[in-house]
Amino acid sequence: MKQKVVNIGDIKVANDLPFVLFGGMNVLESRDLAMRICEHYVTVTQKLGIPYVFKASFDKANRSSIHSYRGPGLEEGMKIFQELKQTFGVKVITDVHEASQVQPVADVVDVIQLPAFLARQTDLVEAMAKTGAVINVKKPQFVSPGQMGNIVDKFHEGGNDKVILCDRGANFGYDNLVVDMLGFSVMKKVSGNSPVIFDVTHALQCRDPFGAASGGRRGQVTELARAGMAVGLAGLFLESHPDPANAKCDGPSALPLAKLEQFLTQIKAIDDLVKSFDELDTEN
């Protein structure tokens, strides 16, 4: 079955092409740390031959506590992204939370992300669609894979068909997430075979029911990523940190930066193997 291709400059994103890594840090903590992390990702992905897009948030607007670190903000964040692009020649993805942020972000980055908690907000979707930029839609934890087609339709109605879908798990009772491996193919089907990627980092979140910060299961990142990529996906969404214990956001789910090359070597091997198989139709 023909898969839709979304182009991010010279990077082609599709379910049957070699996977694209959307990787970086959760939130911009400083200019120097962003440069360090991006440089390491660029070095490793070039060595392994993996198409790469840098990711980070300039503002974590949905933190559980008002006292939690949010990021440098829009203006400073765009300056850092511009420097990363100029220094390393990378494409950049970041998320927006308000319609007023959309155009200033679209002027700098290559992919605009629609956060999971906001994925059904029509005004925000319409503002994002109008930019003509590539869009990454995070599947809300409370929305079934089959309902994602409705969100894609909103973008199409807004004149934008450059849509990537991203799964980050579903609510499983209180304060826990699970990933439905069968949901990936459902998302492909209802979106006209749009590229589907897997946010393994946020799928590892496991909240303290009485706390103000998310916990995580970093020790299981490799097995969960291997399982997801074995389905045959367009890309992997990954966050790393040189010192996860002291990261300002979601450290418990972040891959230690020093383990990146070993981790990606395994993921690439699985992706290469799965995509070497002929398509097998078991419905007929």
From Swiss-Prot:
Gene3D superfamilies linked: Aldolase class I
Keyword Cytoplasm assigned: yes
Main localization category: cytoplasm
InterPro entries noted in UniProt: Aldolase_TIM, DAHP1/KDSA, KDO8P_synthase
GO biological process terms held by the UniProt record: keto-3-deoxy-D-manno-octulosonic acid biosynthetic process
Enzyme class at the top of the EC tree: transferase
Gene Ontology MF terms: 3-deoxy-8-phosphooctulonate synthase activity
Pfam families attached to this UniProt entry: DAHP_synth_1
EC numbers: 2.5.1.55
Protein name: 2-dehydro-3-deoxyphosphooctonate aldolase
Organism: Salmonella paratyphi A (strain AKU_12601)
Lineage of the organism: Bacteria, Pseudomonadati, Pseudomonadota, Gammaproteobacteria, Enterobacterales
GN (gene name): kdsA
